[in-house]
């Protein structure tokens, strides 16, 4: 859709979970490895920010990278 407006559209992707300190995440070593509330769920450890994809005009690559991302957890209620 954006390519219909401009020929120079680019998109990048970065991801953040939360601050990696109390009171935002549980700092117990086991919970840092897998912060999901249910033990049978597998979540990635919390992180402040990850650069995932440089600016690109490739919409398929953007979709693929977003689709590969796992969930994490925090202490929000």
Swiss-Prot record:
Membrane topology: Single-pass type I membrane protein
SUPFAM superfamilies (alphabetical): vWA-like
UniProt superkingdom: Eukaryota
Subunit text: Dimer of an alpha and beta subunit.
Record-stated family: Belongs to the integrin beta chain family.
Coiled-coil features, chain-numbered ranges: none
Pfam families assigned: Integrin_beta
GO CC terms: cell surface; focal adhesion; integrin complex
Reported function: Integrins are a large family of cell surface glycoproteins that mediate cell to cell and cell to matrix adhesion.
PANTHER family xref list: INTEGRIN BETA SUBUNIT (PTHR10082), INTEGRIN BETA-2 (PTHR10082:SF15)
Cellular location(s): Membrane
Cysteine disulfide partners in this protein: 36-43
Protein name: Integrin beta-2
One GO term of the biological process aspect: cell-matrix adhesion
């Amino acid at each position: 859709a954006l390519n219909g407006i401009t020929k120079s559209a680019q998109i990048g992707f970065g991801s953040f979970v939360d601050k990696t300190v109390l009171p935002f995440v549980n700092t117990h070593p086991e919970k840092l490895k897998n912060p999901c509330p249910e033990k049978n769920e597998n979540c990635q450890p919390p992180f402040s920010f990850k650069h995932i994809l440089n600016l690109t005009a490739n919409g398929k690559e953007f979709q693929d990278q977003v689709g590969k991302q796992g969930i994490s957890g925090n202490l929000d209620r």
